[in-house]
Each structure stands twice: as C-alpha cells, then as structure tokens.
C-alpha cells in the first residue's frame, strides 16, 4: 500500500499572477515582497519554520516551460517556490490542463482527452495519478479547527486485475478525506487502510480524535476505528436496516413492507434516545405478535438487540445516523470504477489512481445550481474551508497541496 507520510516534498506552491510573474521572479526584491505578503495572508501553505525567517537562495530556468523558478532556504532546508499556474515537475501550464482534468470528474477516458486536448493517454493518466501523492486531508482541509468531529466510513468492493479488493473510504463534510486499496477486508488490512486518514489528520492536528464514525456494522471496520481512535464512538447506520428489509420484501410482501417502512422511519424521527428505543421495541413486539415473515422480522430483531449502536447518536449532536453522505460519494466512485473497468496495475498504482480521483472530486467545480446554494463556493473543499486561494479550481488544488499537503518537516533536508 502506498505510503503518505511526509516525503521529501520541498515544493511550495504559491498564487503568483502569471501576467506579472516574469517581471517579479527576475527581481529578488520584488519576489521577496510578494512572498512576504503571501506568508502573511496564507501561512498554512508554507513550512511552519518560515515564521523564523528565510533567505533567498538561487534560481533556475525550467527546460520544459522556459520559466524561472526560485528557491529559498528555511532553517538549513531548501524549498522550491513554484507558481500555481505551473503543474508539478513543470510538466505543463495549468491553463492547458484544467479543462481536461475537470472532465475526469465525469470519467472521460484518457484516450478521449488526448484526442481533444492533444498529448497522449499516458500523459493524462500520469497527471491524475500524480495528484494521489498529496495528502488528502492536508490538501482538502487547511485549518486544524476544520477537521471533522463526525465521520462516515465504509469499504467499496472492487477488483484489481480481476481479483477482489477493497477501498476503505472515509468521508465528512461532503468531502472524501481518506481512501486506500486493500486486498482483504479483515481487521489487519482495514486498519492499515483507514490508518492513512489518521496519519494525514495527525499531521494537521497532532491531538486529533474524532468523536463518532458511522459504519455499516461490519466488525472489521468497527475494530479498525476502535484501534485507531480508542475514544471514538462507533455508530451503526440505520439506513442499512431499511435497505435490508426493502431488498428482501418489497416485491413479495409489498403492502406489509410499506407499513413496516413507514413505522421504521417514524422511529428514526424520534426526538429523544428514550423515545427512539421505545418505538423500536414496540415495532419488534408488533412484528413478533403478528408473525411477520423472517425477511422483515430478522432485521428488526437485530436492530433491537443492537439498539445502543443506533441510539448513541442522540448523545452526539451533529453525528451521522445514516451513511447517506458516503453513499452519494460512493455512487461517483462506483461509476468511476465501472467506466475505467476497475484496476489494472499494482496495488500502489491503484491507490494513487483512486486518491487522484478523490482530489478531483473534492476540488472540481460542482453544478452551478449547487454553487448558488453555497454562496458561490464552487467545490466541496471550498465549502468546507469557506474560501478558495484561486478562481481556477486546479490552481486552487495545487496551492492547497503545497508541500504535498503536509506541514511536517521533510525527511531529507537537502
């Protein structure tokens, strides 16, 4: 599985204006003045140590793009300052890339992008996969206070080279905050998969511990979060009880299903934990007394026997009682996996691919009607943070991914 620890990423991505950059970068005084202003306005995209000062080091001209890039030194560590209108490794200018990568949100195949925008399919594949190297948490969330207290988690079942694999997924606030690829769905593999989210979150806030996580009840998922965050409250998804009953009885016992479903959602709407528990008990008693078919009775009895897992949400305001948020995002993931015909390479390549997709999902603009409902904030990431660094969604993503999305010191200082 790919590691997302703070690698020797020493590239700071900054929102320089492409119209004035050439004039600015040639003059160290102008460059430093603009850099000082950026440090004051958005210190989170710079290394923590920069508050103690820095010095101008040197510069070089990119052979690929014929553009000058400057470097600075912060406490004996060298950092490259890359303008946000330039892609990582100087592969291209963002103005030539952003429309094509936006279409990847809708899973337009790489060969089609090459047909319309030029280059070749491998070029576009590598661009998307490279995004997967960035910390998802650190790129998506820019302030420790914005880290969510309440999570939703589940595994997407998919295939790699025809063999079954799983994508442990963590979401909150409408954003995908953690994805990994594992070969199994047992305790050990899922704990490793979900630990990526923990590592990235702790880099942003070392004492971070979420209050709740909503799961589908799978034991390995619950064990993974219990081991990673010992103080977390693990909730079970109420929606899964309804789905289990619906899938087994909607056609064969239609009238009874409608009656039970109505009663079930009335229980869900109970305003207190005590009322919720009472309504569930009465519903189960009715089902037993009237001898409901086992496809309906069994899930209801399971709900009653595990009532604590469903009712604890009343003690945590803002927690997720259902997995609706995750289900909506996983629908997009499901389409992505189907359209790409699942994974074809190594486990590491698969993980980079799905992480790159997650970044695009978090930062690419949404439907204009949705944007209007959020006061002009275009993407889930903007809505979570309440702001953006740049009007171009791709430049906003690149600035957010400064230092690879990590604030910790690089492993290799030179």
Where are these predicted regions, by residue range?
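Short, conserved DNA-binding cores of transcription-related domains
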Residues: 1-87, 340
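Extended amphipathic alpha-helical interaction segments
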Residues: 2-5, 199-214, 221-350
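C-terminal domain-tail junction helix/linker
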Residues: 22, 297-301, 305-328, 332, ...
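Short, flexible loop/turn motifs enriched in small residues
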Residues: 64-69, 160-166, 326
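Short, positively charged, Gly/Tyr-enriched micro-motifs
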Residues: 71, 75-162
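Mobile genetic element proteins and their domesticated derivatives, centered on retroelements
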Residues: 100, 113, 154, 174, ...
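Short, hydrophobic/amphipathic alpha-helical patches that form generic packing surfaces
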Residues: 102, 244, 266, 335, ...
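RNase H-like nuclease fold core
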Residues: 126-212, 219, 223-224
């Amino acid at each position: 599985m790919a590691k997302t620890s703070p690698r020797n990423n020493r590239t700071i991505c900054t929102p320089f204006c492409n119209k004035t950059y050439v004039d600015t970068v040639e003059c160290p005084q102008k460059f430093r003045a603009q850099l000082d202003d950026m440090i004051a306005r958005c210190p989170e995209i710079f290394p923590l140590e920069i508050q103690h000062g820095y010095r101008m080091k040197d510069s070089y001209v990119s052979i690929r793009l014929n553009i000058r890039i400057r470097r600075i030194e912060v406490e004996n560590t060298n950092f490259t300052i890359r303008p946000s209108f330039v892609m990582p490794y100087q592969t291209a200018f963002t103005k030539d890339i952003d429309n094509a990568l936006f279409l990847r949100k809708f899973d337009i195949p790489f060969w089609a992008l090459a047909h319309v925008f030029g280059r070749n399919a491998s070029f576009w594949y590598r661009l998307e996969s490279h995004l997967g190297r960035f910390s998802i948490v650190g790129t998506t969330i820019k302030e420790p206070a914005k880290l969510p207290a309440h999570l939703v988690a589940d595994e997407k079942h998919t295939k790699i080279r025809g063999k079954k694999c799983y994508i442990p997924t963590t979401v909150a606030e409408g954003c995908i905050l953690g994805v990994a690829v594992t070969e199994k769905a047992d305790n050990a593999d899922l704990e490793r998969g979900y630990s990526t989210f923990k590592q990235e979150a702790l880099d942003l806030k070392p004492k971070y511990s979420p209050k709740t996580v909503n799961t589908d009840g799978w034991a390995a998922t619950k064990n993974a979060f219990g081991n990673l965050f010992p103080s977390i409250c693990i909730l079970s998804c109420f929606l899964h009880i309804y789905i289990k009953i619906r899938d087994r009885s909607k056609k064969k016992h239609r009238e009874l299903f409608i009656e039970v479903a109505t009663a079930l959602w009335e229980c869900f709407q109970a305003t207190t934990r005590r009322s919720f528990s009472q309504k569930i008990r009465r519903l189960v008693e009715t089902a037993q007394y009237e001898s409901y078919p086992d496809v309906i009775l069994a899930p209801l009895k399971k709900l009653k026997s595990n009532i604590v897992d469903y009712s604890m949400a009343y003690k945590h305001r803002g927690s997720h009682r259902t997995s609706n948020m995750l289900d909506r995002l996983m629908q997009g993931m499901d389409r992505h996996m189907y359209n790409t015909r699942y994974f074809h390479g190594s486990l590491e390549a698969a993980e980079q691919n799905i992480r790159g997709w997650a970044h695009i999902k978090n930062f690419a603009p949404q439907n204009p009607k949705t944007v209007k409902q959020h006061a002009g904030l275009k993407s889930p990431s903007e809505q979570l943070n309440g702001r953006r660094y740049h009007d171009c969604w791709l430049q906003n993503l690149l600035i957010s991914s400064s230092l690879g999305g990590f604030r910790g010191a690089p492993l290799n200082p030179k």
